[in-house]
Amino acid sequence: DVLGSRGLGDVYKRQPADVYPLSTFADIKAYCASRHMRLWQYAEECEGTEIWDYLKEVWRCMREAVTRGLETEGTLKGGLDVQRKAKMLYRQNHIDESAETRENRLVCAYAYAVSEENAAGGIIVTAPTCGSCGVLPSVLLYMQERRGFTDTEILHALAAGGIIGNLIKTNASISGAECGCQAEIGSACSMAAAALAELHGMELDQIEYAAEVAMEHHLGLTCDPVRGLVQIPCIERNAVAAMRAINALSLANFLTYTRKISFDVVVNTMYETCLLYTSPSPRDPK
């Protein structure tokens, strides 16, 4: 069934395959709480222990994308004359740089690195898409370097972030062409915030709050790449979303039990916003 059509083509009602037996965060949270499980344990229970070999490869590819991006200079192809900025950003440290400024600079440099690799046709991990591939690896690598988290802890965080991404894909969309950039960068930010919360050993309610905040403040964001290339504003948008994921983590740490909105509600709202975005406008030519 065609739900609507606007600029980027027809939008069809999706019927995604089930990955996990439970399809809402509320149900997963209740299931995990009743069994004293972490989200990564739920992923392992559903997918088997082989998930860890897969995620090891995912993490290796993510790290390598950051490394390549930080080492490469030049102009991205496509005609927009976009200069690669990750290396410059990474090296622009100052003697009087504050800890907060350094964190922002490094996280952004890592996000730029991966996003520029994507724009250049390099190997990246869709997390959840190519256009939003810089958010998750940038925050996880920064936290590993800063806090000394083990690779095993990173893999657990990736599993938690993957559950969030799957829930968004199941109940809404991760496609920018279908639902705007709220579905790409919003989903990536939500996955990253949840992964960070898992990495820091937060409770399920706190993980949910981090994911909810991260998605909520991307609602309505449009897919608007200049000349259709995943460069402007896409690369910069990855860096901004990475910082926002860290902000969502901080809020979840302090304000979880004051929240009024669930993650599931925000995901549904995102898809409702998508339908408004793709519905014919009264001003559209007949």
What is the predicted function of each stretch?
Residues 1-12, 277-286:
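Single conserved hydrophobic/aromatic residue that forms the stacking wall/gate
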Residues 125-132, 176-188, 234-238:
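Active-site nucleophile and cofactor-binding loops and adjacent substrate-binding regions
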Residues 17-20, 31, 46-54, 58, ...:
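Catalytic cores of large soluble enzymes that bind and process phosphate-bearing ligands
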